[in-house]
């Protein structure tokens, strides 16, 4: 079944009362205040009528109220879009959970330490569109914002990052849109991580929708460095900021060397382990029957 189409033209058809009431009931969940929105819409109409008495006609008032209601219709569409991105996060997280469980059974260890997901806040989406000189609309969000839905996968070792990436991209329903490897080519400030933009299908009750998700894969050490650097980025007027930036960059290099050494030590341990006997292999298989898959 084809995707539902959306109309964001403020002069387009006005949603029914049921749709408007439903959107108002759910606005608080979106971080919007329905009372404030109602005041803004009513105030806009009344303010224009007061400033321009010639506009005070039934036809003009109806037209302006129609546009205001259409704006609420756009909010309804935006709410639906956020729901679809939230579902996309559930789908992509399930894929990583399955891979982690498989690795645990096949290789007796989990390459993924933990997973975080997030939906970009409305104000952040609006600011990003503004920087691109784009209007706030469902179409612009889908076309120009790649990181509305984001998932961060934290691994123990650097080679786990690429193993997880390879396993994900082998899946037939995962389409790679963009890849940026900041591990092999770090940012000037020392930031390291693997970034992917992928498209995955999400099946809803009446249609299927291809949704974009930003995937960040990094080690535990890369992640705690990035968390501290993120704090610095959004703090204003920090004393000795240049010195802190330089020290963070140096720490990034040290963390990278530590990640490499830890991975090499693991490889040496694995290489130095003697080949198991047939009885040991059988015992290991029996133990795996009781493995905790949670």
Put a short name on every predicted segment.
Residues 4-55:
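Intrinsically disordered, low-complexity terminal tails and inter-domain linkers enriched
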Residues 37, 41-89, 96-102, 213-294:
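An acidic, glycine-/histidine-flanked metal-binding catalytic module
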Residues 71-81, 110-119, 145-147, 203-216:
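Short charge-dense sequence patches
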Residues 79-125, 130-140, 147:
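Active-site acidic/histidine clusters and adjacent loop/turn architecture
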Residues 133-138, 150, 161-162, 184:
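Accessory alpha/beta interaction modules
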Residues 142, 155-264:
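Long beta-strand-rich cores associated with HINT superfamily self-processing modules
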Residues 148-154:
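Terminal, regulation- and interaction-focused segments at domain boundaries
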